[in-house]
Structures are given as C-alpha cells and as structure tokens.
Amino acid sequence: MPVVLAEFIDYSLEWLRCESLPFPVLNFDVWNNIRGSNLHLGPCFDQTVPGQKLTLPFLKRFTESSGIADGFDCGTLVQRRQLNNTLNDSSCQDLAAKTGEILGMIKRTLARTRSCSHASIEWSPIVEKACLDFFSPGNLQRFLLLFWSGWYPNSPIIHKPTFNSEAEPPGLIASMAVLGACLSPDSNDCVRAMAWLTPVEEVVFADNILYDDSIIASSNLVGDEAVVWDKLKALHAAYFICIAQNWEGSKEGRQRVRKDRYSRIVSIARSFGLYNLSLAKLDTTFSTQQKWARFILLESMIRTATYIYLLDSAFVLYYRLPPRVISLELNTGLVCPEVCFQAESAAECFLQLHMATMGKQNQSSLTVSSAVRLLCSPHNLDLSIFHNLSSFNMFTIISALCCLVFQYQTTLVDVSQVTPAATGLSRWKWLWQRGGHIVVDSDGYSVENMWKRVGFMQHANEYYHLACAMLERWKLTEKQIGDTLAAWAAPVGSVQGNPKYDDGEMVQVKALIHDMENMTY
C-alpha cells in the first residue's frame, strides 16, 4: 500500500477505537477541542465492546464484485431461476411488435452513425438474426422480469403498476432488457448481453428528444403531458444503459460512461428542470385519476433526479471523479414512501399519502439540499421534522454528506471548517438509529413481490462509517494537516503514492474498507 495512503488510513481509523457497536459515532472530543470551533457534541451511544470488529458487508461486496448481480442486492440465484416458472406465453406474443421496433431502431442508428460508432458492428444478415434472437418476444419477457425482480429495487424510478411494456418506447425496453439480461442465471444470456450494450447505448443517446431544451418540467404539470413523458422515458433509457455499461461493459465502455455519457445525463436533467420539483402542493385529501396521474409523473421525475445524483455521488466516492451534481443544487423534494409509489390504484395511493403526511406538514417541504443544510447547521435543531424518513431518503442524505467530506479532502480547508459535516453525520446517525431501519434479506419476499423490496439503500449506515473514517483525517493537529496536504500536493505519479483521481479500479476505497474491517478495538 502506498505510504501516504497508509498514513491516511491509519489516521482515519482512529475513530473506531472509541466507537460503539453496532452503531459507531464520532469521537466528539476531537471536534470539541478544535480551536475556534463552535461545535459541542457528545456521544449518544454505549461504549465499545472490546475485541469486536466493524463489518461492512455491502461495501465490501460492492467494491470487490465483478458485476451487477454480485455487487448489488439483486435477489439470490435461486430466486432468479424461479422467475422462469412465472413466464406467460400470451405475454410473449404481445411483445412481438416490440421486437421488430427494437430491431429497426438499432439497424437505423448503426447505419446512420457508422463512421463515428463505438459499437464496431457491421450490420449483416448474421447480425440481424442475432439481434432478433436476443430481443425475441420470449427473451424480452424473461429479461424484463429479471429487471423488475432483480434490478428495479435498486433504482425504483419507473411506476411499475401503470407500466405497459407494449406501449413503451423501444429504446427504454431495449435498455431495460439488456440490464435484465445481465442478471440472468444463464451465463449465455450474460455473454450475449455484453455484445448489445454498446449498440443500445448508441441508440438511446441518439434520441433527439433528450436534447430538446424546450421541454421543461415543473411542479405545475397535470400529469398527461405526452412530450414530458417521452423525454423522461428517454432519460430512463439512458440511465439504465449507463448502469449496465459501467458495471458490465468493457474498459472502454465503462470509461465512456463515467467521463462522457453520464455528464450528458446530468446536463439533460438540469436543462429538463428535474432538480427543482416537489410534491409539496399536491392535494392528498381525496383521490382522482387526474391527481394520481400528476403524482405519478412528478414522483417519477423526483426519483429520477435523485438517482442521477446518487450515481454521480457513487462515481465521486468510488472512482474519485469530480462531482457533476452539487448537493445544494438538488432542490427536489424528498421521495414519497414506497407503499405510495407501489400502490395499484389512485384510492390506495392517496390513502397511503395521506397517512404518510398526516402530522408531518413541514416534512413535505423538505428538499435534499435543505435537509443537508439543516443537519449540518451549528444551531439547535428540532429533529422531529426528519421523523421516520425512509431508507431511500436517509441514503440520499448520507450520500450528500459523504460527498461533502470528499470535497473537504480536495480543498485546503482549515480543520475548524469541517465541523458542519461532523454535525450532520452525528445527527444523521441519531436519526438512523431511531428510525427502525433494519436490513431485510431478499429471501423474505416471494418471487412475485421481489420488486417491492428495498435495494442497496438499506445499507446506508455503512456509508456513515465510511464518511466517518474519511472525516477523521481532519483530527490531526495543524502541523500534521500541513504535512498531509503537502504530501497530497506532490506531483501526479510521484513515489509518495499520492491519492489517485479517476480511480477506475476503486483501489483507495477498497484499501480503506479493508483496513476498517480488520481493526479490532
């Protein structure tokens, strides 16, 4: 391990020695003794049980896995095999027209972009047959089922109860199918999916509606604006193919997603107006089909904006890429409870919405940026406004706090200036422990209901530990900080082993997680 990195990790692990299990908190004496700091906090958990180790099962698996199925919560191999027993022959035939649409779309796009294509595919009768075979009606049904049951809980941005695969754009169906195929228990499906990652990527990013800046979303939409829906679905297609390409594609494909394609997605979402949406003005007192349509559109856009931010924050934390979405520009409202978004009817949805918002009027006005600001505030705060936030919302907030810590690492800040992050982390942990959040294994769900489970967001507490370990670097004295910053400022490639940016192999975060898990305290 590089010398400088080892020194960082040694210091960053000091906090573990004074932690409680299973919910560590910061060693607040560090912050209370900072000269000029107004932060005065105290630990609110019991002391450490000697000899125990911190475990970070999700982060360890995520950083060491080689693909989506192994790295994320996508159900067990047995569950994904059982999905084949739920296939319906009549549904297969209904998707025959979609197979033809996907074939025509890919063929036209590759012919049009042949001179500048990344796909390296020369269209021929053999390629056409392979395309028809991979996107056949039967395969589409299987792959979409794998998408819903395996991947969907990790990014529930589409309203499944009203989703109609026969009526959806071919680009979206192709993107979802490729991602679903990557989760197939049949290795042949996975291998064939690799061949179609880049062609589908080119198809969805060639959709002109993505770049139409005249289409702008707002909280005043009524829910039936076709052109807004079309752009949102095109954005979903681009998002899903980026997920598949980044975790299953070639080295070139992964780099293209992280450096180019995802920057486009962020820019498109920004010009689309997705970072300023909220359900605060939605009347939940009684249900109508029109209000349900409005809810579905607005909540889908809010979730899309949030997940675009979450993937960007993952690129920041794991690959040390500069952030493209700033936490404080994310003025989207917090997402609604999953039972509301999963409801099968307007009546059920609005009943759940009414119950969720009853007595929590102020919570509906929270945005991601305001939540982070409040938690990091030096002033006394009534935390009841955050009462019973979902794992989804808590994960979004801890991701923002992690990115805040990362930004400290890349600037020459004085140690007294990092107290907002320490405050935010301590308050977040207090809320998490009192929110009744537990990790639920996918085995507890029937095959038919796997799409309703909570995805990787339920492991948000592991991100808290990671943020604390990173933040402890500022526990050093003024002189030690100066020495550390001098080492970080060494020229790229120097023998000191300075931190690497655009770390495609996640070397540094893997090393940090390894050392955290192997320290006994």
What are these regions (language model features)?
Residues 1-168, 175, 179, 199, ...:
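Intrinsically disordered, low-complexity activation-like regions
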Residues 168, 172, 233-236, 300, ...:
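Structural signature of alpha-solenoid helical repeat junctions
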Residues 180, 184-204:
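Carboxylate/His-rich catalytic cores and anion/metal-binding grooves
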Residues 181, 185, 246, 402, ...:
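Specific register positions within alpha-helical solenoid repeats of the TPR/Sel1-like families, i.e.
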Residues 217-220, 229:
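Long amphipathic alpha-helical scaffold regions
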Residues 226-238:
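Short HxH-centered metal-ligating active-site micro-motif
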Residues 454-479:
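C-terminal substrate/ligand-recognition segments
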